């Protein structure tokens, strides 16, 4: 068993189903403190967070990630114990091996090797870790930790988020940004009545239908060189009882935007409200901004990562903003150069989640090389 797989074995053994950390961060903190890192816990309710830093002056490169994992689903469908790392034919199985305890193991191993190789390097190396990335408690995680760091005057120059960015092999895709995410819960009141007497009722389904037709056919924007066009999806509609002879008296609807840098949350809100106003409706709308879009399309970090990937796999990486949101959205607004570089995402959140030993070794070597370029060269 290699050093990386031993670290990964230890991390997988903690059943850290979001937002529970289950001991992962205690393990990581002890590991880093033994290397000379200064660590501070930034826990917030059920979510565990910590920041660790090695070095006193110079540019600060932070590796960010999360210790929480999604639920395993039906354990009987797994070929292995999801919380016990198992190797089969060069593949490593367990919940979180790809998303993203494999990256965490690479980060820890790289940090130990880097400090042993360069004990007095002219810069700072950091870790920003949360257990609140996978669930609804994300606001208690990285956003909270970043606020605390700002209050302490800690400024991050570069950040590598270890999310599983890769498609076929480690490094073939680097995420240089993510779309924004805006959700809305809409409530529209009508008047319940008998279907035989519609003139005595007010059907909210009929009232909202032209609004939905307008919103679902709307071209929000054309995207740009880095982002696809903004998309709106209706995710939930509920209209009360199940009786076939009752006109419902109320309607609840949820929708979500994934939006490009061509929009802001306020511009989207305005267009939704205007659509309702145009049809003389005044619903109650509860908005939730899950994250603004961010983009790192240039800079020292990106160039270092591109060159590193080219050196290790022989091709330049695809630069992408596809996929869901990540905690990079909470770090970039502080003026930080942010990219995502991690393992292959083909099996994340699935039964029999896995990664290859080769990909682990490649990722650790890439992390080491990037540190050399940013903190040594």
From Swiss-Prot:
Coiled coil: none annotated. The keyword Kinase does not apply. Binds 2 Zn(2+) or Co(2+) ions per subunit. SUPFAM superfamilies: Bacterial exopeptidase dimerisation domain, Zn-dependent exopeptidases. Keywords: Amino-acid biosynthesis, Cobalt, Diaminopimelate biosynthesis, Hydrolase, Lysine biosynthesis, Metal-binding, Zinc. Its EC number is 3.5.1.18. Pathway: Amino-acid biosynthesis; L-lysine biosynthesis via DAP pathway; LL-2,6-diaminopimelate from (S)-tetrahydrodipicolinate (succinylase route): step 3/3. GO terms for molecular function: acetylornithine deacetylase activity; cobalt ion binding; succinyl-diaminopimelate desuccinylase activity; zinc ion binding. The keyword Amino-acid biosynthesis applies. The active site is at residues 68, 133. Catalyzes the hydrolysis of N-succinyl-L,L-diaminopimelic acid (SDAP), forming succinate and LL-2,6-diaminopimelate (DAP), an intermediate involved in the bacterial biosynthesis of lysine and meso-diaminopimelic acid, an essential component of bacterial cell walls. Homodimer. Belongs to the peptidase M20A family. DapE subfamily. PANTHER family: ACETYLORNITHINE DEACETYLASE, N-ACETYL-L-CITRULLINE DEACETYLASE. This is Succinyl-diaminopimelate desuccinylase. The lineage of its organism: Bacteria, Pseudomonadati, Pseudomonadota, Gammaproteobacteria, Legionellales.
């Amino acid at each position: 068993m290699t050093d990386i797989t031993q670290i990964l074995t230890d991390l997988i053994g903690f059943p850290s189903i979001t937002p529970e950390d289950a001991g992962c961060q205690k393990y990581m903190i002890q590991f880093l403190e033994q290397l000379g890192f200064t660590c501070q816990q930034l826990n917030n309710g059920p979510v565990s967070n910590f920041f660790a830093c090695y070095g006193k002056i110079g540019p600060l490169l932070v590796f960010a990630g999360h210790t929480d994992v999604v639920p395993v689903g039906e354990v009987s469908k797994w070929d292995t114990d999801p919380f016990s790392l198992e190797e089969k034919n060069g593949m490593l199985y367990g919940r979180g091996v790809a998303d993203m305890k494999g990256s965490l193991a690479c980060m820890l191993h790289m940090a130990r090797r880097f400090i042993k190789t360069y004990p007095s390097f002219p810069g700072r190396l950091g870790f920003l870790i949360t257990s609140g990335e996978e669930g609804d408690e994300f606001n208690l995680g990285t956003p909270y930790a970043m606020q605390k760091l700002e209050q302490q005057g800690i400024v991050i120059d570069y950040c590598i988020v270890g999310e599983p960015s890769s498609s076929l092999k480690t490094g073939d895709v680097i995420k240089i940004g993510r779309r924004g995410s805006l959700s809305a819960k809409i409530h529209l009141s009508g008047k319940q009545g008998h279907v035989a007497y519609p003139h005595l009722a007010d059907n909210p389904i009929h009232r909202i239908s032209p609004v939905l037709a307008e919103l679902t056919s709307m071209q929000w924007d054309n995207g740009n060189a880095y982002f696809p066009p903004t998309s709106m999806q209706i995710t939930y509609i509920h209209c009360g009882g199940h009786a076939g002879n009752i006109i419902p008296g109320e309607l609840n609807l949820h929708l979500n935007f994934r939006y490009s840098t061509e929009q802001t949350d306020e511009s989207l809100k305005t267009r939704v409200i205007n659509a309702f106003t145009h049809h003389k409706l005044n619903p109650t709308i509860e908005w939730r901004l899950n994250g603004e879009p961010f983009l790192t399309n240039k800079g020292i970090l990106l160039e270092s990562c591109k060159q590193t990937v080219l050196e290790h796999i022989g091709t330049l990486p695809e630069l992408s903003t596809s996929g869901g949101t990540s905690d990079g959205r909470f770090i970039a607004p502080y003026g930080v150069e942010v990219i995502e570089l991690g393992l292959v995402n083909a099996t994340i959140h699935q039964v029999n989640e896995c990664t290859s030993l080769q990909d682990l070794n490649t990722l650790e070597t890439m992390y080491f090389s990037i540190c050399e370029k940013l903190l040594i060269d």
